[in-house]
């Protein structure tokens, strides 16, 4: 592949996207859910120029839309070192019906540790946000971060 054809991809939270990009996503959703809606009417409904819509429409995709074929992702959890913490995490993963690809638990230092999980959600419609939310709700989990995903 020629370097000039190579495009980098970034994972970015919606709340930091420019308004025109967020509106483009909303328009794409509206067009997908209502096949009778024209692009002209959709951009008018969301108060976005057609040129802005055309500029972004093929460059922005919700994470879950791109993960439908390959729903593998890696999370890192920052936890307090207590007996059974890994078991609690794995119990949540099991209840969400996810497959564990790899697990790494760091050696605790100053009663803190990290757990890195590579997961596969291919057989389930669970979103990454659902998984992160469920793990964040566990006692003794101070932070959960998405560190990679396959697309």
Swiss-Prot record:
InterPro entries: ACT-like_dom_sf, ACT_dom, UPF0735_ACT_dom-cont. Belongs to the UPF0735 family. It comes from Staphylococcus aureus (strain NCTC 8325 / PS 47). Residues 74-149 form the ACT domain. Gene3D superfamilies: 3.30.70.260. It comes from the Bacteria. This is UPF0735 ACT domain-containing protein SAOUHSC_01752.
């Amino acid at each position: 592949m020629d370097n000039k054809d190579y495009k980098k991809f970034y994972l970015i939270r919606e709340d930091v996207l420019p308004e025109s990009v967020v509106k483009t996503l909303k328009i794409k959703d509206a067009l997908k859910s209502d096949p009778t809606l024209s692009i002209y009417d959709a951009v008018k409904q969301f108060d976005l120029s057609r040129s802005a819509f055309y500029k972004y429409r093929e460059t922005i995709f919700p994470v879950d839309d791109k993960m439908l074929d390959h729903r593998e992702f890696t999370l890192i959890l920052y936890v307090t070192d207590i007996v059974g913490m890994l078991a609690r995490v794995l119990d949540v993963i099991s209840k969400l019906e996810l497959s564990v690809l790899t697990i790494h638990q760091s050696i605790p230092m100053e009663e803190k540790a990290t757990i890195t999980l590579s997961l596969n959600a291919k057989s389930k419609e669970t979103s990454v946000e659902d998984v992160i939310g469920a793990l964040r709700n566990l006692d003794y989990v101070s932070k959960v971060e998405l560190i990679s995903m396959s697309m």
